[in-house]
UniProtKB/Swiss-Prot annotation:
<dbReference type="InterPro" id="IPR011060">
    <property type="entry name" value="RibuloseP-bd_barrel"/>
</dbReference>
<dbReference type="GO" id="GO:0003949">
    <property type="term" value="F:1-(5-phosphoribosyl)-5-[(5-phosphoribosylamino)methylideneamino]imidazole-4-carboxamide isomerase activity"/>
</dbReference>
<dbReference type="InterPro" id="IPR006063">
    <property type="entry name" value="HisA_bact_arch"/>
</dbReference>
<feature type="active site" description="Proton donor">
    <location>
        <position position="131"/>
    </location>
</feature>
<dbReference type="InterPro" id="IPR006062">
    <property type="entry name" value="His_biosynth"/>
</dbReference>
<dbReference type="InterPro" id="IPR044524">
    <property type="entry name" value="Isoase_HisA-like"/>
</dbReference>
<dbReference type="InterPro" id="IPR013785">
    <property type="entry name" value="Aldolase_TIM"/>
</dbReference>
<keyword id="KW-0028">Amino-acid biosynthesis</keyword>
<keyword id="KW-0368">Histidine biosynthesis</keyword>
<protein>
    <recommendedName>
        <fullName>1-(5-phosphoribosyl)-5-[(5-phosphoribosylamino)methylideneamino] imidazole-4-carboxamide isomerase</fullName>
        <ecNumber>5.3.1.16</ecNumber>
    </recommendedName>
</protein>
<dbReference type="Pfam" id="PF00977">
    <property type="entry name" value="His_biosynth"/>
</dbReference>
<feature type="active site" description="Proton acceptor">
    <location>
        <position position="9"/>
    </location>
</feature>
<dbReference type="GO" id="GO:0005737">
    <property type="term" value="C:cytoplasm"/>
</dbReference>
<keyword id="KW-0413">Isomerase</keyword>
<dbReference type="InterPro" id="IPR023016">
    <property type="entry name" value="Isoase_HisA-like_bact"/>
</dbReference>
<dbReference type="GO" id="GO:0000105">
    <property type="term" value="P:L-histidine biosynthetic process"/>
</dbReference>
<comment type="similarity">
    <text>Belongs to the HisA/HisF family.</text>
</comment>
Length: 243
């Protein structure tokens, strides 16, 4: 069944939202991240998603203490991403109690290391974040969306699915933080070609209709801004996906 996965992006402990990954287009929310996650958990969320934007920019400043506290204080699965660049970082996050680590640009820039991480920690502990943008075809973007690689999304998926990949988090960059609606066609295409891969959809969720459009296609839908802005609640999202 498709799950709603509430998300928080954190910079120096503050809950923020960026538009299309741009640190200059930042909105700060006056929420305590632990209280917010507990609120989402109480509402029925079975998984939570955290992006460490401080660590993404500077790995030496990764918010390990806060991440460990969040992982210990909530009783549901927490997955964490944000510029993970090494096996040591992935291990440190898992040691903090994180259920899944999200690997992004590394999948394109250093496939050997990415495969080592997949092998060492197992396919249930790793989510491949494939941020994509439509050129002539869907290509994967790297470096916090600063540049488009020459790697086609479907080719990357084909490569890793043959190496045991089980979970992906796919973001249509053109949609992220815009609340313009999800790119359901993209996720349907991935699901048709790779039915064994669990897809987490991200970017552009603006209404319950978006959740409806992804029901049965994706294993999870990551929702950040729509929940923070009160467009709909976790309870409403769950009801929509269960009906």
């Amino acid at each position: 069944m498709t799950q709603i996965i509430p998300a928080l992006d954190l910079i120096d402990g503050e809950v923020v939202r960026l538009v299309k990954g741009d640190y200059e287009q930042k909105k700060v929310y006056k929420y305590n991240p632990l209280k917010k996650f507990k609120e989402y958990e109480k509402a029925g969320a079975k998984e939570l998603h955290l992006v460490d934007l401080t660590g993404a920019k500077d790995p030496s400043k990764r918010q390990f203490a806060l991440i460990e506290k969040l992982a210990k204080e909530v009783s549901v699965n927490l997955q964490v991403g944000g510029g993970i660049r090494s096996k040591a970082e992935a291990r440190a996050l898992l040691d903090c109690g994180v259920k899944r680590v999200v690997i992004g640009s590394m999948a394109i820039k250093d496939a050997t290391l990415c495969l080592e991480i997949l092998k060492e920690f197992g396919s249930e502990a790793i989510v491949l974040a494939l941020d994509t943008i439509l050129k002539e075809d869907y290509v994967v973007a790297v470096n916090a969306w600063q540049e488009a690689s020459d790697k086609k999304l479907m080719e990357v998926l084909d490569f890793y699915s043959n190496k045991g990949l089980k979970h992906i988090l796919c973001t249509d960059i053109s949609k992220d933080g815009t609340m313009q609606g999800v790119n359901a066609r993209l996720y349907k295409l991935i699901h048709e070609i790779f039915p064994h891969i669990c897809i987490q959809a991200s970017g552009g969720v603006a209404s319950l209709k978006d959740l409806e459009n992804l029901k049965g296609i994706c294993s999870g839908v990551i929702v950040g801004k729509a929940l923070l802005d009160g467009v709909f609640s976790v309870e409403e999202g769950i009801r929509c996906l269960e009906n």
